[in-house]
């Protein structure tokens, strides 16, 4: 039986999303980790997400990492994003959600709504600096107590973020 932590993430083929970047760092530190994405030459926006064998991919995985903005990457990434969290819950993996800003900042409310719909499946919720400010503004809360309020309302075990302007985590 394999030992140690294993992480998987749904990521774009270029590796430019935060989940792919986290997996790259984890791999460089020696953690067994992999990125699930479209096949080479396949359009990521419309890749065959139904071909992903989540049960196999999650065998022995401890963590599944997703980015909130993945729901705006196209219909297939959005469906794979949702499926990854559902299968993680069924297979006993922990879900990490990195709440980042979508390429179109106007869609942040839709992205945040999608995260809220999956909140019971999330174990770690991390906000990037820009998303922390945008979502706290959406929620009508100042940044200083926003993370605590999210934690209390959602019962997610770990809610965290980083604010460059406040120099706090």
Model region roles, listed by residue range:
Residues 1-169:
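Ribokinase/PfkB-type carbohydrate-kinase core domain
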